[in-house]
């Protein structure tokens, strides 16, 4: 959520930033108009309360003098009714302002490229060379079924479209990837591992920006009023919600592996086969909570943490900066890492790393103190995939397949696969 002082002090800047996202800048004028009404009502109620205090003193004086105070008491009641009416109006205006503010996205950083869609994202780095196959490579959705690593048909029977059973070596590979990523982040990148709730309340979803604007993308347990998490970013970032972090604690670096649940509203017809776009998938998430002056360096470091995994796994990828028309609601700047998938003959997103500046912190009321005597300030929050496990699984299957239908295990994963170096079709 944005600070209303930005609207008062720099309205044109806010308008231009909103317009860059393709949204209507008129909301700035709406906020300012309501803010002016709010100020007038506050002034009016303060005036009325001062008058009520004066009348209260007058009543006390009359009673001390044993004079008739009925007319003054009547005036006091009238003032009380007027104050109550103004307070109700003020509450209504406050709610209108908040309802607008919570739907306005974060302000985009100056170096984010302008563009209308993902086609205008800007590549800033490329690593590795896509493999030149001497045979026709298979798509991961075909190869995993041949190797008995996954069963999409039975998952559809049990749950519907966009679900999967991972079986035998498929389950082993998924677990190996999760353990490898968590080990890398905790032993080499300085993150603290967390195991988080995977059902959260509405306040938590509001804090990270999923609610109210993106409720259709979420799965909800209606009876309890809880939501399944779309990413571990949600519980990790909200760890300090409504708290003041004490001096010396920051920066906090959290990582967690969770199942993630997404309705994929608006994705009909896209990536309907395989592991790329499921309703339920595993992901290892990175979250950083830092002091404001450290957040831009933290974004670079976090992105490099995700890149280190792709490089150690030997998976070709590229880094792109998301343009103004593709960047997420809560982000001020986002890097996407896209891994090479032969079945698409293209790069597909495998990680998204964002600096949300103080946008989520204001929504979730997360503050810190620099020292014991200082005033609390809003933190900056960052999040990134480190990595999406299912998409990494798919990338390994496609990039490490062999002509005889077997699958070579990347060297970095062998210790996490119980020493297994190759996956072959099981006898039964």
UniProtKB/Swiss-Prot annotation:
GO MF entry, a single one: ATP binding
Protein residues bound to ATP: 262-264, 349-352
Residues holding L-serine: 231-233, 285, 385
Pfam families: Seryl_tRNA_N, tRNA-synt_2b
Record localization: Cytoplasm
UniProt pathway annotation: Aminoacyl-tRNA biosynthesis; selenocysteinyl-tRNA(Sec) biosynthesis; L-seryl-tRNA(Sec) from L-serine and tRNA(Sec): step 1/1
EC number of the protein: 6.1.1.11
GO annotation terms (biological process): selenocysteine biosynthetic process; seryl-tRNA aminoacylation
GO cellular component terms given for this protein: cytoplasm
InterPro entries in alphabetical order: aa-tRNA-synt_IIb, aa-tRNA-synth_II, aa-tRNA-synth_II/BPL/LPL, Ser-tRNA-ligase_type_1, Ser-tRNA-synth_1_N, SerRS_1_N_sf, SerRS_core, tRNA-bd_arm
Broad class of enzyme this protein falls into: ligase
Catalytic reactions of this protein: tRNA(Ser) + L-serine + ATP = L-seryl-tRNA(Ser) + AMP + diphosphate + H(+); tRNA(Sec) + L-serine + ATP = L-seryl-tRNA(Sec) + AMP + diphosphate + H(+)
Principal cellular location given in the protein's record: cytoplasm
SUPFAM superfamilies reported in the protein's UniProt record: Class II aaRS and biotin synthetases (SSF55681), tRNA-binding arm (SSF46589)
Similarity field: Belongs to the class-II aminoacyl-tRNA synthetase family. Type-1 seryl-tRNA synthetase subfamily.
Role according to the record: Catalyzes the attachment of serine to tRNA(Ser). Is also able to aminoacylate tRNA(Sec) with serine, to form the misacylated tRNA L-seryl-tRNA(Sec), which will be further converted into selenocysteinyl-tRNA(Sec).
Stored PANTHER family: SERINE--TRNA LIGASE, SERYL-TRNA SYNTHETASE
Subunit structure as annotated in this protein's UniProt entry: Homodimer. The tRNA molecule binds across the dimer.
Domain-level remarks: Consists of two distinct domains, a catalytic core and a N-terminal extension that is involved in tRNA binding.
Protein name as annotated: Serine--tRNA ligase
Organism name: Staphylococcus epidermidis (strain ATCC 35984 / DSM 28319 / BCRC 17069 / CCUG 31568 / BM 3577 / RP62A)
Gene assigned in the entry: serS
């Amino acid at each position: 959520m944005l600070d209303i002082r930005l609207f008062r002090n720099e309205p044109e800047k806010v308008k231009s930033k909103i317009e860059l996202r393709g949204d209507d800048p008129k909301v700035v004028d709406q906020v300012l108009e309501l803010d002016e009404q709010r100020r007038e009502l506050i002034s009016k109620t303060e005036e009325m309360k001062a008058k009520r205090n004066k009348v209260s003193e007058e009543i006390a004086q009359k009673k001390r003098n044993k004079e008739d105070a009925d007319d003054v008491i009547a005036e006091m009641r009238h003032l009380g009714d007027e104050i109550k009416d103004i307070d109700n109006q003020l509450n209504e205006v406050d709610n209108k302002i908040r309802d607008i503010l919570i739907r306005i996205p974060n302000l985009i950083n100056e170096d984010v490229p302008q563009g209308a869609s993902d086609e205008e994202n800007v590549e800033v780095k490329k690593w590795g060379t896509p493999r030149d196959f001497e045979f026709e490579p298979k798509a991961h959705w075909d190869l995993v079924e041949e190797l008995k690593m996954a069963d999409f048909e039975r998952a559809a029977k049990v749950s519907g479209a966009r679900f999967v059973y991972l079986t035998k070596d498929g389950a082993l590979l998924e677990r190996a990837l999760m353990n490898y990523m968590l080990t890398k982040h905790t032993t080499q990148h300085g993150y603290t591992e967390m195991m988080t709730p995977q059902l959260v309340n509405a306040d938590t979803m509001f804090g990270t920006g999923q609610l109210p604007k993106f409720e259709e993308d979420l799965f909800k347990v209606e009876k309890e009023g809880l939501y399944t998490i779309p990413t571990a970013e949600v519980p990790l970032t909200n760890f300090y919600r409504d708290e003041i972090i004490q001096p010396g604690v920051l920066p906090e670096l959290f990582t967690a592996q969770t199942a993630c649940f997404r309705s994929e509203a608006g994705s009909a017809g896209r990536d309907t086969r395989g592991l790329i776009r499921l309703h339920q998938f595993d992901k290892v998430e990175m979250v950083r909570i830092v002091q404001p002056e450290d957040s831009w360096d933290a974004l670079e470091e976090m992105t490099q943490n995700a890149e280190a995994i792709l490089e150690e796994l030997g998976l070709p990828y590229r880094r792109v900066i998301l343009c103004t028309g593709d960047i997420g609601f809560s982000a001020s700047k986002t890097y996407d890492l896209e891994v090479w998938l032969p079945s698409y003959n293209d790069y597909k997103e495998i990680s998204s790393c964002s600096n949300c500046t103080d946008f989520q912190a204001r929504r979730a009321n997360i503050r810190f103190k620099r020292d014991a005597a200082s005033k609390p300030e809003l933190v900056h929050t960052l999040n990134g995939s480190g990595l999406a496990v299912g998409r990494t699984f798919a990338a390994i299957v496609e990039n490490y397949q062999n002509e005889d239908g077997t699958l070579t295990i990347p060297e970095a994963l062998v210790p996490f696969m119980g020493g297994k170096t190759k996956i072959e079709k099981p006898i039964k």
